[in-house]
Amino acid sequence: MLKYDVIVIGGGHAGVEAAAASARLGVPTLLITLKPENLGEMSCNPAIGGIAKGTLVKEIDALDGLMGYVIDQAGIHYKMLNETRGPAVWGPRAQADRKLYKKAMYQILTNYPNLDILYGKVEDIEIKSSKIEAVILNNGSKILCQKIILTTGTFLSGLIHIGQKKIPAGRVDEEPSYGLSNTLKQIGFKLARLKTGTPPRIDGRTIDYSKTILQPGDKIPRPFSELTNIVNVSQINCFITKTTSETHDIIRENLDKSAMYSGQIEGIGPRYCPSIEDKIVRFSTKSEHRIFLEPEGLDDYTIYPNGISTSLPEDVQHKLIKTIPGLENVKVLRPGYAIEYDYVDPREISVTLETKKIAGLYLAGQINGTTGYEEAAGQGIIAGINAALAVKDQAPFMLTRANSYIGVMIDDLTTFGTIEPYRMFTSRSEYRLSLRADNSDLRLTELGMNIGVVSEKRKKIFTKKCEDIEKIKSLLNTLSLTTSKLAKMGIQVAQDGTYKTVLDLFKIPNFNVEQAIKIFPMLKETQNKNILQLLYIEAKYASYLTRQHADINLFQSEEAQFIPKNIDYFKIPSISLEIQEKLSSHKPTTIGVARRIPGITPAAITAIIIYLKTKYSDGSST
């Protein structure tokens, strides 16, 4: 009988990261997927990154994950979103060649040490004494294991809706999983339904691009991965068009035929990625909505019209598309659809992503109520790391709100749960100026090195970068000019007769890296503009970052105040029954987590701290 230490069920974005992370830690790992050729399949939009999402990708890369490196092998349109705003909200994004992305992912995983890939379908999980024993395949065979990571995406009782038509599926042409849904229910997990959707795909050869707006990418693509020096994939343009009043009229006239508005769909859809029906209803005063025409590949004429996700009947989809400028004669290749699926209340898992009910069972991705490739991948890598560390009897690896967007996401999910698809935003992070995309490796790679999940190649690159940062920082502190010379160059500084270093100049409004290179040409020789940009940001926002670091220190002190598992909140007389019930239900692990539970007052937190000091002053906390 086959036996593995860790088995990952599902080969989507969460699954591939989980399997690779577990394998990197030297643990024999099996990835079970319906179609190995679809590893890392982009079920919806063929793009990686975006605002907040791009930071997640950089954090995954910092821990030696796959997503950033793979998109650099397949990215055909790179663009830094929000670049005209502050660096805390910059969002690296890349449109992908769908085929190249899957090909690169397949090549990496099929040659990954300690990782086997099995074509198959898991029907059940064998559990004994609340511990994982094995997985059972649909052919009746059993594979023994210590840990299981469930990354089922939209496959748990998945149901596609196109108008009134219902199609049981995990995605187009792939059957859903009912067995695992039943298993989770039998274990006692709280399952609910969520919904997501995708737009129709159209033939780019039938688009009149003269009626659209050109959207070029960045002139020089900025790679996601620290392992990538230059993006060598050909770059192409995207285009923008918009809906019209006629489009809106057709949608309004047919709302009763939409699966969303006919009452056919029970699941709640993503608030921040609404269907075109939702947009017309919720934003009824808007006369138009933008649509981004995004190519799906270099040698693929399929276009993804980002912005018109729909569950309307096929004939209505055809009608509304032809009212859009440039799409009057377009050929529809595949209809859009909505898909419903089961998910588990994420408050049923801990911050390691292990379930509280079953030891050795981990959940990652859409099964936890999230939406998006990047959110799934971020959970996958943490689940994979922790499953492998548990096999090795090592301490768990936990990211926090203070050091990563991944930590913010996991804390949000495990503390508050979610009743709608959870998407990451910069606004969810209270420390976003410190948690930027450009410093992800400086925040996380050393943590990854400490637990052994980072390769030797990445270690060398990271070590070299840290050395370069110190050298360039020293140079910036050395290069200087008098205020009078700077004034002659048109740079407005106080004429106090002092010398100003480059780091001083970075703090001046409207002064940037390009100006510094112009004044001090030797900075060109640093050969790393990314480091200059990093040091520029750190200098420019130094006072804000100092204050934020003080806030982070306070946060970390509260996170270090652990709450014993056996605490009885009903024995703390100075807090209300309502708060006692909330705390008993949530079971916060630290004072910091307790403070973030809605409705928990500062007075209650003080009461808990005092109680812990008196009750557990001998250090006993089990």
Swiss-Prot record:
NAD(+) binds at residues 269-283. It is found in: Cytoplasm. GO terms for molecular function: flavin adenine dinucleotide binding. InterPro entries: FAD/NAD-bd_sf, GIDA_C_N, MnmG, MnmG-rel, MnmG-rel_CS, MnmG_C, MnmG_C_subdom, MnmG_C_subdom_sf. Its cofactor is FAD. SMART domains: GIDA_assoc_3. Keywords: Cytoplasm, FAD, Flavoprotein, NAD, tRNA processing. The keyword Hydrolase does not apply. The keyword Coiled coil does not apply. One of its GO terms (cellular component) is cytosol. One of its GO terms (biological process) is tRNA methylation. FAD binds at G10, G11, G12, H13, A14, G15, V122, S177, Q366. Belongs to the MnmG family. Homodimer. Heterotetramer of two MnmE and two MnmG subunits. NAD-binding protein involved in the addition of a carboxymethylaminomethyl (cmnm) group at the wobble position (U34) of certain tRNAs, forming tRNA-cmnm(5)s(2)U34. This is tRNA uridine 5-carboxymethylaminomethyl modification enzyme MnmG.
